[in-house]
Amino acid sequence: MHLPSLSVALALVSSSLALPQAVLPENDVSSRAAAVKEAFSHAWDGYMKYAFPHDELLPVSNSYGDSRNGWGASAVDALSTAIVMRNATIVSQILDHIAKIDYSKTSDMVSLFETTIRYLGGMLSGYDLLKGPAADLVEDRTKVDMLLQQSKNLGDVLKFAFDTPSGVPYNNINITSHGNDGATTNGLAVTGTLVLEWTRLSDLTGDQEYAKLSQRAESYLLAPQPSSGEPFPGLVGSAISIQTGQFTNGFVSWNGGSDSFYEYLMKMYVYDPKRFATYKDRWVAAAESSIDHLASNPASRPDLTFLATYNKGSLGLSSQHLACFDGGSYLLGGTVLDRADLIDFGLKLVDGCAETYHQTLTGIGPESFGWDEKSVPADQKELYERAGFYVQSGAYILRPEVIESFYYAYRVTGKKQYRDWVWNAFENINKYCRTESGFAGLTNVNAVNGGGRYDNQESFLFAEVMKYAYLTHAPGMSSMPAAAEDKANKSRG
C-alpha cells in the first residue's frame, strides 16, 4: 500500500534498460550477493522454525502471526526471490505448501488488494519464472502447473468482490458468506493495483473473466468523473464510489492509498504496449503534471526534490517511505519511452529519498517525513537544516521502496553510487533489524539503535527487500535478459 508498496512486477522491463558496468571486483560483488542470500536464509529459517505454515514470523517473541488469512503469506511471497536466488530447497518447500492451501477457507475478512499482490502475484510470478528462465530449477513440472491452478482457484474465490453496481470492487470481503464490510468507497491504489495480476491470470488460463473484471474497475480510474476528481491531467483523487465509479474527492498523492495506481499504469504498458497504450498515456500525464504541480524543494535543502500532496488548492509538504517508489517509476517510464527528462527527474526523486536514509542515526529512512519550514518540531530543527526534512513517523517496518528505486537507478545508469546505496541500506537493515530468528521493524530510525522493535516480519521482506538487494549484486545477473530479470521483481507496492 504499498501500503503498499509493493506492487507486483509481472511487468517486463524493456531490454533498453542500461546494463550496469562492474566496478567492484567480481569477488566483492559475489560476497555482497552471498551476504544477502545469507540474510534471506536466516529470515526463512526462523520463519520455518517458529511460524510456518502461518503468515508471518514474530521475530522478537519467536512466535507467529496470521494477518493475511493464515494461508502462509511469507512462503508465497518469498517464492520468486527464492527462485531468483536459485535456492531449490526453499522453492520445493514453498511449492509443497502452496499445493496444500485451501483458499476457500478462512475465518477472517479478506483484503482483495493484499491477497492479490501477495498471494496471486506471488504464485503467478513464480509460475512465469519456473516456466521460463528458471525452468531447470524444478524437475516435477506438475508442481509448476499447480501454481497456475491455485492462482485460478484464488481468483475464483475472490471474484465476487467485483459484483457491485459499478464494477468497482469491495476490498474487505467475507469469502464464506460473500459479504463485505459495507464500505461505500474504495481507494485509488486498492482499486488500481489489481489489473496486472488479474490480466496475467486471464492471459495464462485463457479465461478472460479475470481481466474483464479488473479492467472494468480500472476504466473509472482512466476516465475519471466528475472533473473535480482530476485536479491536474492524470492526477486523480484517492477515493471512488463503489456504487457509481465516480471519484468522491480530489486529494492527490503518490503516498500510500494512491501510490501503486500510478506504478501499475506504466507496468501495464510495459506488459503489453499494444493493449495498454491508454495506460501509458495516463501515466505520462500524471508524471508530467507531478513535475509541474507537485515537485517541491525544501527551503533548507533546495537541492532535494520530493513530491508533495495536493488538496483543494493547497500543497501538503510531507511524504512517506511508500512514496519513494516514485523515482523508480519515473526511471522505468523514462527508459521505456526514451524520455531523458523523465529519467533525470526520477534520479532527483531517488536522491531525495536517499537523504531520508543517509541523514538518520540508523541509516534507514522513516515511515513519513515533512519539509514544511513552518512546521518543524523544535527538537528537529538541526535535522531539518542539515537534511532538508524532519521525521513525522520514525517507524521502519521493513519497507522496500527506497531500495527499489536505488535498484532502478543502478540498472538504468550503471553508476556504482546507486549499487553502494543499496548495499549500505541492506547493511543497516541487517545491523539494526536482525534478531535471533529473523528481522524486526524499528520504532524510531533516528534514535540510537533504532529505538524499540516491532515484533513482526512482513512478507515483503522476502518478496522485495531481499530481492532488490540481491539482484543489485548478484554475479552474472547483468547478463540475464532484462525482461526476464524484472519478471521476477515484485515492486508496491
From Swiss-Prot:
Its main location: cytoplasm. GO terms for cellular component: cytoplasmic vesicle lumen; endoplasmic reticulum; membrane. Its EC number is 3.2.1.113. Its cofactor is Ca(2+); Mg(2+). GO terms for molecular function: calcium ion binding; mannosyl-oligosaccharide 1,2-alpha-mannosidase activity. Involved in the maturation of Asn-linked oligosaccharides. Progressively trims alpha-1,2-linked mannose residues from Man(9)GlcNAc(2) to produce Man(5)GlcNAc(2). Keywords: Carbohydrate metabolism, Cytoplasmic vesicle, Disulfide bond, Glycoprotein, Glycosidase, Hydrolase, Signal. InterPro entries: 6hp_glycosidase-like_sf, Glyco_hydro_47, Glycosyl_Hydrolase_47, Seven-hairpin_glycosidases. PANTHER family: MANNOSYL-OLIGOSACCHARIDE ALPHA-1,2-MANNOSIDASE 1B, MANNOSYL-OLIGOSACCHARIDE ALPHA-1,2-MANNOSIDASE-RELATED. Glycans are attached at N87, N174, N489. The lineage of its organism: Eukaryota, Fungi, Dikarya, Ascomycota, Pezizomycotina. Residues 1-18 form the signal peptide. Ca(2+). Can also use Mg(2+), but with lower efficiency. The active site is at E367 (proton donor). GO terms for biological process: carbohydrate metabolic process; ERAD pathway; protein glycosylation. The gene is mns1B. It comes from the Eukaryota. Monomer. Disulfide bonds join C324-C353. Pathway: Protein modification; protein glycosylation. This is Probable mannosyl-oligosaccharide alpha-1,2-mannosidase 1B. It catalyses: N(4)-(alpha-D-Man-(1->2)-alpha-D-Man-(1->2)-alpha-D-Man-(1->3)-[alpha-D-Man-(1->2)-alpha-D-Man-(1->3)-[alpha-D-Man-(1->2)-alpha-D-Man-(1->6)]-alpha-D-Man-(1->6)]-beta-D-Man-(1->4)-beta-D-GlcNAc-(1->4)-beta-D-GlcNAc)-L-asparaginyl-[protein] (N-glucan mannose isomer 9A1,2,3B1,2,3) + 4 H2O = N(4)-(alpha-D-Man-(1->3)-[alpha-D-Man-(1->3)-[alpha-D-Man-(1->6)]-alpha-D-Man-(1->6)]-beta-D-Man-(1->4)-beta-D-GlcNAc-(1->4)-beta-D-GlcNAc)-L-asparaginyl-[protein] (N-glucan mannose isomer 5A1,2) + 4 beta-D-mannose; N(4)-(alpha-D-Man-(1->2)-alpha-D-Man-(1->2)-alpha-D-Man-(1->3)-[alpha-D-Man-(1->3)-[alpha-D-Man-(1->2)-alpha-D-Man-(1->6)]-alpha-D-Man-(1->6)]-beta-D-Man-(1->4)-beta-D-GlcNAc-(1->4)-beta-D-GlcNAc)-L-asparaginyl-[protein] (N-glucan mannose isomer 8A1,2,3B1,3) + 3 H2O = N(4)-(alpha-D-Man-(1->3)-[alpha-D-Man-(1->3)-[alpha-D-Man-(1->6)]-alpha-D-Man-(1->6)]-beta-D-Man-(1->4)-beta-D-GlcNAc-(1->4)-beta-D-GlcNAc)-L-asparaginyl-[protein] (N-glucan mannose isomer 5A1,2) + 3 beta-D-mannose. SUPFAM superfamilies: Seven-hairpin glycosidases (SSF48225).
